[in-house]
């Protein structure tokens, strides 16, 4: 969870907080490489929540451009990563959504680390969408109301999440000192380990990343047992 771009810019003395977003965007490619270096084969980057879409039009336009640039960078042939979009692209301007889809399509056959780009994403909405899709399929198959109710099970819902077919996250990292999930992968992170740091995202270093990995490796995961 790449948080703290604006606060970093203000505390660094920049009058234009957009500088924080730009520096933070450059950090994403670095972080993906760090993950690849320690054999992490799947990472999800929370770039824009549904709530973020309520920000000013000026800031949103900047964010849209930056996010599209991130997608373009990840889609470069030398990265060999596989981009997957999770969220509501229909909430984005068409040109931005188009660039994101092109990045996803261009990397579909790559063999490197998988990178989920969470854009226009909301954890609650993801669950709602999954249940609605499950019920719609059941309705189309002619299931009765009782059968539809019976069809709503944990595994069935998981099958229709944006991240269907992927494992749940082992570790969630959030920068900037905020200690909450803010809607991030609410279903999938039920038993994820969570690591918080006061460091703002633009200042997040490889050593910080490795500390998170080391801390995670020393935890005993019981999955509620």
Curated annotation (Swiss-Prot):
GO terms for biological process: polyprenol biosynthetic process. Binds 2 magnesium ions per subunit. Keywords: Magnesium, Metal-binding, Transferase. Pfam families: Prenyltransf. It comes from the Bacteria. Its cofactor is Mg(2+). GO terms for molecular function: ditrans,polycis-polyprenyl diphosphate synthase [(2E,6E)-farnesyl diphosphate specific] activity; magnesium ion binding; Z-farnesyl diphosphate synthase activity. Homodimer. Belongs to the UPP synthase family. NCBIfam families: PRK14828.1 (NF011403), uppS (TIGR00055). This is Isoprenyl transferase 1. It comes from Corynebacterium glutamicum (strain ATCC 13032 / DSM 20300 / JCM 1318 / BCRC 11384 / CCUG 27702 / LMG 3730 / NBRC 12168 / NCIMB 10025 / NRRL B-2784 / 534).
